[in-house]
Swiss-Prot record:
Membrane topology: Multi-pass membrane protein
UniProt keyword annotations, A-Z: Cell membrane, Heme biosynthesis, Iron, Membrane, Metal-binding, Oxidoreductase, Transmembrane, Transmembrane helix
Enzyme Commission no: 1.17.99.9
Record-given protein name: Heme A synthase
Record's subcellular location: Cell membrane
Gene: ctaA
Intrachain S-S bonds: none
Pfam families xref list: COX15-CtaA
GO biological process, one term: heme A biosynthetic process
Entry binding sites for heme: 256, 316
């Protein structure tokens, strides 16, 4: 009974974290992230209701660089759209944190979660507590002289969310999945190594994807597989190792492509390793990996070719999480044996 309760709670948390990540991506893609210029963790749980309240929020927004440099002259109705997107993202983050924090404290004191199992839950709790601060730290970078948030802070904010999801999803499958019964002579060394490598490169790729979004690097070189008929674009060919390149959208897009190829190759090798084991559950994971990889690669290419359509770009981000989830599931099953 207790195990079932924990499983359902973790499942709800995983869904909520994914939803928050996707809404956060849409908020970035629509340029809505700087529409709320204050951080009020408690009093900010309700949106403006009256016309006067909306006018007050709009007046605050007009005092910051984004209005004057990017959105000068927008109407109140247009402001409401971007404001509500950012509001929903923040509200969803608060709700997700509450759904996690309150039950985990209850489960601990009621001994539903044993002391020996508490470490990952405590780490997730701490990350939930700091994530709001990190989000505001990111937003604050776009409220100073430049109307654009730091792409590094944006990537850090996303990676913390992904780490939270990783911890919760791992605990979910730990509660839900049975250990595989496979003959002892089966060699798991290669699939274990490649599942670990796959998790690492997907994390790197998600981080790079956030840098691409932060610099609007998806709006340039909208061709595939080459960048203006070149593998390495001219802008970075002669100064490839310059640290300043990490502020250059051309370089960031190139590295995102490069790591994307690495993700594809590593996951394909992992799929081959799983199919060679000839176990129904691992074979099923291999097929799930094929689907997730295909969707991730195809939506990424479409996002690039069509200059970042919001729906496709959001699906691309979603499938990055789905691909990561399947690899984590694979890693757990192999490691548990």
């Amino acid at each position: 009974m207790q195990k079932s309760l924990i499983t359902k709670w973790l499942c709800i948390n995983c869904i909520m974290v994914i939803a928050t990540i996707v809404i956060g991506g849409i908020t970035r893609l629509t340029g809505s992230g700087l529409s709320i210029v204050e951080w009020r963790p408690v009093t900010g749980i309700l949106p403006p209701f009256s016309f006067e309240s909306w006018q007050s929020e709009f007046a605050k927004y007009k005092a910051f660089p984004e209005y004057n440099s990017v959105n000068y002259g927008i109407t109140l109705s247009q402001f409401k759209f971007i404001y509500l997107l950012e509001f929903i993202h923040r509200l969803l983050g608060r709700i997700t944190a509450l759904i996690y924090i309150v039950p985990v404290i209850y489960f601990y004191f009621k001994d539903v979660i044993k002391n020996r199992d508490m470490l990952p839950y405590i780490i997730a709790l701490l990350l939930f507590c700091v994530q709001g601060f990190i989000g505001w730290y990111m937003v604050k970078s776009g409220l100073l002289n430049s109307p654009y948030v730091s792409h590094f802070r944006l990537a850090f904010h996303l990676i913390i969310a992904v780490i939270i999801y990783h911890i919760l999803f791992y605990q979910l499958i730990k509660n839900r999945c049975d250990i595989l019964l496979i003959p002892s002579q089966t060699d798991f060394k290669l699939p274990l190594i490649f599942s670990g490598i796959a998790i690492t490169v997907v994390y790197v790729q998600i981080f790079l994807g956030a840098l691409v979004a932060g610099l609007d690097a998806g709006l340039i070189y909208n061709s595939f597989p080459l960048m203006d008929d070149r593998f390495i674009p001219m802008e970075i060919k002669d100064n490839f190792f310059d640290l300043k390149n990490w502020y250059d959208p051309v370089f960031i897009q190139f590295i995102h492509r490069l790591v994307g190829y690495s993700v594809f190759l590593v996951v394909v090798v992992l799929i081959i390793c799983l199919l060679k084991i000839e176990h129904p559950k691992l074979n099923k994971i291999a097929y799930f990996l094929m689907i997730a990889l295909f969707m991730q690669v195809s939506t990424g290419i479409i996002t690039l070719l069509y200059s970042v359509p919001i729906i496709i770009a959001s699906i691309h981000q979603l499938f990055a999480i789905i691909l990561l989830s399947v690899i984590i599931w694979c890693y757990f099953l192999i490691k548990s044996f």
